[in-house]
Amino acid sequence: MNRIVGLETEYGCLTNDFPGTPSAITRVRDWIFRDQRYGLIDVHQRDWDEPAGNGGFLFNGGRAYIDMGHLEYCTPECLSLIDILRYDSAGDTILMNALKSMRLEREINFIRNNIDHY
């Protein structure tokens, strides 16, 4: 393949959040960056709709962040299809590990509802 490619996956979230508690998406983001330290959270605002602390870059070269109320995961730029599959699978694994570690796999469901490619 003579092209650099990557995927951006949006995850819809179904949850039983109660009023006054942090959102499930926020708790998962915090688990990724603060508890597990899988990457570095952004310390500066990236855009008008992406404030500081909204997400960050992962040590695998990808990016996880909250966009308009849903979690997104972007693979790093890749040169092969097998790398795209590996990094895309890594995003799903990170989410599954978060839910298992926080014992929320029965309370929260993430659904891959949109994939953009570039």
Which residue ranges define each predicted feature?
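Terminal catalytic/cofactor-binding subdomain
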Residues: 1-112
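Histidine-centered divalent-metal-coordination microenvironment in nucleic-acid enzymes
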Residues: 114-118
